[in-house]
Amino acid sequence: MANGNKQAGQRISPSLTLLLATACGIIVANLYYAQPLVGLISKAIGLSPSGAGLIVTLTQIGYVAGLLFLVPLGDIIENKKLIVVSLLLSAAALTLTAFVKHGTLFLAAAFFVGLGSIAAQVLVPFASYLASDAARGRVVGNVMSGLLLGIMLSRPISSLVADIWGWNAIFALSAVVSVILAIVLSKVLPARKPTANTNYTALLGSMWKLLRTTPVLRRRAIYHAFVFGAFSLFWTTVPLLLSGPDFHFSQKAIALYALVGIAGAVTAPIGGRLADRGLTRLATGIALGVVVVSLLLPLMIQSSSPVGITVLVAAAILLDMGVSANLVLSQRAIFSLAPEIRSRLNGLFMAIFFLGGAIGSSIGGWAYASGGWSTALWIGIAFPVIALLYFITEK
């Protein structure tokens, strides 16, 4: 068999697992750095208030395009090369975002930042190839912990860096880090050349068939699309609540609040270990239930008192715990399928649930503007409840 498949099933070292987790966190953070800085960026590059949302939207569109059209390449071309080229593309786009002053050029660069960030989703199945069957859940869980930490840390880090050095600095710093990471990974990662005998057109054509004929993929994508929709809705609206007249949180205080979500990432490896022990179904039900509870708490107790703030902190931790665990359980289930199609399965899974997150964000902003915090929470609760009801039908 080819190089990469000989590697599969070997024991992955703790140091390589840590490197992959760190790399995933660094890469995926690029998708979120701009979110708390949209107001500052739009003024600097001359975008109207109505066009400011395109900064985040085009990054997301670029990422989804990469998930659908680039990540599947991991099934037919050498993985390390795909990872390094994607990182260098992202670094070039980040450099442009740091220095261009023209709105159209910035938005084009934002698209390519998203496109290049798919390197993280090539690394995750890559880690699963290197792990033995018995340890696959644990390894994927550890790598996903790094990815989730990147998501959770990105917003407070970009806010704090912008507060000190200006909004450009975070993109310039990330460009430098991306180049360094590309060099390190090119030296350290083992080669993996897939054995799939197909061309790119046939590869893309097979994805719709995979979605139709793989029930585990469909179920797991639907579960996590609703869960991630609730996650995105919460983290889109809670900064609006905290900066409003009831709480009067500063940008730094909101950044510190966002840091509490880090505690939730610790459940990712726990979820992986439970899956390795054959407890995927039980753990999935618990994870979905935790997400429902996390949104019920702030709905039942709404106050700007210390008790109310404590409830919001607990809600953030529980939400991130449930989402993190469900993500790892889902990827463990998907990566247990045929290894030669893992990149396509992962690309489809990520694209579907990321679309759910984008819908959650947009609905959250509308719900908060239309009916306030309670309306947003009720809609947010509906998402994991639907996922839980669908989960009950699983045989």
UniProtKB/Swiss-Prot annotation:
GO molecular function, one term: transmembrane transporter activity
Location of this chain's protein in the cell: Cell membrane
Superkingdom field: Bacteria
Protein name: Uncharacterized MFS-type transporter YdeR
Primary location class: membrane
Family: Belongs to the major facilitator superfamily.
Stored PROSITE patterns: MFS
SUPFAM superfamilies reported in the protein's UniProt record: MFS general substrate transporter
GO cellular component: plasma membrane
InterPro entries attached to this UniProt entry: MFS, MFS_dom, MFS_trans_sf
Keywords: Cell membrane, Membrane, Transmembrane, Transmembrane helix, Transport
The keyword Cell membrane appears for this protein: yes
Topology of the protein relative to the lipid bilayer: Multi-pass membrane protein
